[in-house]
């Protein structure tokens, strides 16, 4: 039995917890984690390496200050750490990028759809009716979003009737997440209206049809976006090139490594500006021992400056 304590949750958090509990009632106990949602304990089990606090639904809660730092990341900086750690399938591209001038950063709230199948769909409808709950739709998941979330949706690349939101629901997602964002392996509709709403989004296509001929089969479970397995609570970082899904346990290391890469690029360009060196003298590693020492001293000084700037006043 799920127990709700007197912990200080805001109304939206309580609503999200209740929605998760309600959806769990619709699924057979042996497979509900596969079909509809992970329990809080299952989320904790599958993300046991994460070092942070957790959201009420059990997802890792990457701290807000680290999410702000992530807005300065580039795809290359994220890749440097992930490939070193053996996470080679964390990047998805090939999207239409809406509002490409805005960086997408937030915690993954994952949603899975599958093509409609009448016998399975009929059972889900019957279970919902018997439980006094409405039919499962895209809005079932959307209404569970919290501030800082990015809505990440596996709609299996569907274009026609694969539109997760139009401009009205896009606006709601923006308000509910605080401008977090949207990534959908599917489509959106009402592009003219969406273009006026200040939230980053990534989709495969734009189509005028409403969502249809699909079944909602998972909320906050592992999903597939392109070649990526996305876990609930992954840090989602998107730029003009594509989207990275960073495991929470690697976020701090990615950010610290990015600082070093920024400083290295800064120093390299300064040396090129002097006009005294060939590219191979400086990049990617200085050949002269004196230049190597100069760089190490520059790196140490700049890291100290950056850390001082970030420390609480």
Model-derived segments and their meaning:
Residues 2-19:
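Bacterial N-terminal signal peptides that target proteins for export
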Residues 73-77, 81-232, 246-294, 299-313:
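Feature captures the catalytic cores and cofactor-binding loops of soluble hydro-lyases/lyases
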Residues 242-244:
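Channel- or pocket-lining gating/hinge segments that regulate access to a cavity or pore
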């Amino acid at each position: 039995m799920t127990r709700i304590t007197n912990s200080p949750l805001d109304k939206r958090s309580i609503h999200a917890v209740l929605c998760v509990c309600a959806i769990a009632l619709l699924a057979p106990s042996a497979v509900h984690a596969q079909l509809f949602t992970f329990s809080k304990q299952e989320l904790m089990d599958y993300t046991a390496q994460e070092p942070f606090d957790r959201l009420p639904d059990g997802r890792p809660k990457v701290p807000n200050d680290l999410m702000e730092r992530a807005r300065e990341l580039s795809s290359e900086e994220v890749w440097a750490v992930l490939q070193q750690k053996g996470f080679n399938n964390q990047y998805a591209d090939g999207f239409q990028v809406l509002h490409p001038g805005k960086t997408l950063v937030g915690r993954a709230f994952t949603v899975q759809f599958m093509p409609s199948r009448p016998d399975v769909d009929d059972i889900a409808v019957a279970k919902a009716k018997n439980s006094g709950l409405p039919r499962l739709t895209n809005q079932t998941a959307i209404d569970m979003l919290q501030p800082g979330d990015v809505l990440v949706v596996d709609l299996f690349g569907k274009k026609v009737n694969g539109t997760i939101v139009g401009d009205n629901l896009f606006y709601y997602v923006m308000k509910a997440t605080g401008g977090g964002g949207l990534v959908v392996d599917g489509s959106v509709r009402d592009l003219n209206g969406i273009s006026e709403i200040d939230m980053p989004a990534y989709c495969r296509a734009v189509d005028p049809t409403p969502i249809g001929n699909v079944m909602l089969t998972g909320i906050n479970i592992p999903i597939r976006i392109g070649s990526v397995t996305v876990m609930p609570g992954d840090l989602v970082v998107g730029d003009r090139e594509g989207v990275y899904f960073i495991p929470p346990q690697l976020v701090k290391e990615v950010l610290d490594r990015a600082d070093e890469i920024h400083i290295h690029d800064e120093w390299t360009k300064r040396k090129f500006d002097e006009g005294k060196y060939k590219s191979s003298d400086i990049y990617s590693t200085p050949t002269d021992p004196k230049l190597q020492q100069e760089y190490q001293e520059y790196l140490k000084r700049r890291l100290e400056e950056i850390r001082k700037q970030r420390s609480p006043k």
